Design a protein with these regions (language model features):
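Anion-binding and metal-coordination hotspots
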Residues: 3, 11-15, 24, 94-511
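Conserved glycine(s) in the ABC-transporter nucleotide-binding domain "signature"
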Residues: 1-107
Length: 511
């Protein structure tokens, strides 16, 4: 060690004792900053005096501390029992328990659901994932046996837990209840009682499928679901499911059913009325009787205007007009007609295509027995641009009815996340029990996805669910053996900015 006297840019003089090791200088002790040469000399003398009394001892203490530090670090590292990249598991376990799914006693369900949210894979790949990342040994055959058990004894409890949690968040009531259907296809053309070809919403015409109906709450939480035969007409799925849901969960009539016009027919509306349900439905205004259609087309087309048509049965037809929708209707029709004209010109249009599907509705057969595009039909269709109808028997004003109907996007998003992010389809199970169990696992996984989304919002994390999960995937927990105590100490490490950003989600006791 030696004393360094350094003149600073400001003209002051710094006096420090420094040491040199391995070509690097380290400050050992500072003695101050002098404003004059006299003060600098005085500090320099004090530093030399200190150095004469501490030089040997300092080197000895410093070397001793370094040796102890190395020894303690090596001992600590030698006692590390495990290092797990388990941030996702820790986070999703808390969400799983906070909803109440820990009431289902089988831990294998927890493993399957959390794996479905964090790393959706086949059941075989899930086994490997659980072992690699969480050190969980789960046998594949055990998974299949459990899926049979889930179908036989636990599916009802899972839906009950989900409904009660949603009720709790909604102040004890369900309120709005959105219904829609989608299709789930299989990587096979084989059929049975449940799996059959049908109209596919995924464009899979060759594969067998099932129809999935789902009820979703106003906040987007999944309430209940049912599977139907793959060839089932979607309009026949809604009433049985709502009746069953109401009976199973003792709902009373404190809810309003919201559904798209594609699910509606006169029979469904009649059944809703007879059951005493409140509803908001998409209307097929072009299918109304002549008097109603004449009234609709006589309405003044003012942007965002709403008009009520009272029916005798206490039902209202609400018609709204939107300039934005009118432009979209015209744009889509022009594109469709352009494709039709191109197909007609090339001779690809046949008589079999003269139907009411899509823009084929503008086709007709001429007197010369040729397929032509009807300009009269196009002109008639233009009259309806920008008009949209809604049917309701509620007391809500027209603007509120329209706003609630537009909440149907929550069901569409539920299907999009379940089928895409959570990879509910394609399905590779071929027995009814395991198909139902697979959908139940995905249903619970989506419930956890939605609850995590709510917690992210409450804690003002400012990230999407997917980005939070990505950050959690690199959070590590170490476990260290304490030989003297005969116990273990664990520590979850939040090392990066992203880790620190999501850290509030790892303590959900206040949410």
């Amino acid at each position: 060690m030696f004393v360094r006297k350094k003149t600073n840019r400001s003209g002051t003089i710094s006096v420090v004792v420094v040491s040199k090791a391995h070509g690097k200088f380290t400050e050992v002790k500072k003695f101050g900053v002098a404003k004059s040469e006299e003060e600098g000399d005085e500090l320099f003398r004090k530093a030399q005096l200190w150095l004469r009394t501490h030089d040997g001892q300092q080197e000895l203490d410093f070397d001793d501390r370094k040796g102890k530090e190395v020894e303690e670090t090596e001992r600590f590292l030698g006692n590390i029992d495990s290092v797990l990249i388990n941030g996702t598991q820790l986070l999703l376990n808390q969400v799983y328990d906070s909803i109440g799914f820990n009431q289902i006693p089988d831990e294998i369900l927890r493993h399957l659901v959390i794996a479905r949210v964090s790393q959706p894979k086949s059941k075989l790949a899930t086994v490997e994932y659980l072992k690699s990342y969480y050190d969980e040994d789960v046998d594949l055959n055990h998974i299949y046996r459990y899926m049979d058990k889930l179908y036989n004894t636990q599916m009802e409890l899972a839906q009950q837990i989900s409904v009660e949690h949603t009720r709790k968040l909604s102040g004890g009531k369900i309120g709005l209840m959105f219904y829609d259907v989608t299709t789930l296809y299989f990587e096979t053309a084989d059929t049975d009682v449940l799996r059959e070809p049908g109209f596919s919403k995924d464009g899979k015409t060759a594969e067998s499928q099932v129809v999935l109906g789902m009820l979703v709450s106003e906040g987007g939480y999944p309430l209940s679901y049912s599977l139907f035969n793959g060839s089932q007409y979607e309009g026949f799925t809604m009433i049985p499911m709502i009746d069953d849901f109401k009976q199973r969960f003792n709902l009373g009539k404190d809810f309003v059913v919201v559904a798209d016009s594609g699910l509606m027919n006169k029979n469904n509306v009649t059944l809703l009325q007879e059951a005493g349900y409140k509803y908001i439905l998409g209307a097929r205004i072009k299918s109304e009787n002549a008097n109603v259609k004449q009234w609709i087309l006589s309405l003044e087309k003012v942007d965002k205007a709403c008009y009520n048509y009272e029916r005798e049965n206490g039902e209202r037809l609400i018609v709204s007009y939107s300039e934005k929708r009118a432009k979209k209707d015209a744009y889509n029709r022009d594109r469709g007609i352009a494709r039709l004209r191109k197909a007609c010109k090339s001779g690809r249009i046949t008589k079999n295509q003269v139907n009411k599907r899509g823009y084929n509705k503008f086709l007709e057969i001429s007197k010369d027995i040729e397929v032509v595009i009807s300009e009269e039909k196009i002109a008639e269709d233009c009259k309806w641009d920008g008009l949209k109808g809604y049917i309701t028997n509620t007391d809500l004003d027209a603007e509120r009815v329209i706003a609630e109907y537009h909440g149907l996007w929550v069901v569409e998003r539920a299907f999009r996340v379940s089928k895409g992010t959570l990879e509910m389809r394609p399905m590779f199970h071929f027995t009814e029990r395991r198909i139902e169990a697979h959908v139940c696992i995905c249903f619970i996984a989506y419930k956890i996805y939605k609850e995590l989304e709510r917690l992210i919002d409450i804690n003002k994390i400012g990230m999407s669910v997917d980005k939070v999960l990505d950050a959690a995937k690199t959070i590590t927990t170490i476990r260290v053996r304490l030989p003297e105590n005969g116990t273990y100490a664990t520590k979850t490490l939040f090392l990066t900015e992203k880790h620190l950003a999501v850290k509030p989600l790892f303590d959900l006791s206040d949410n």
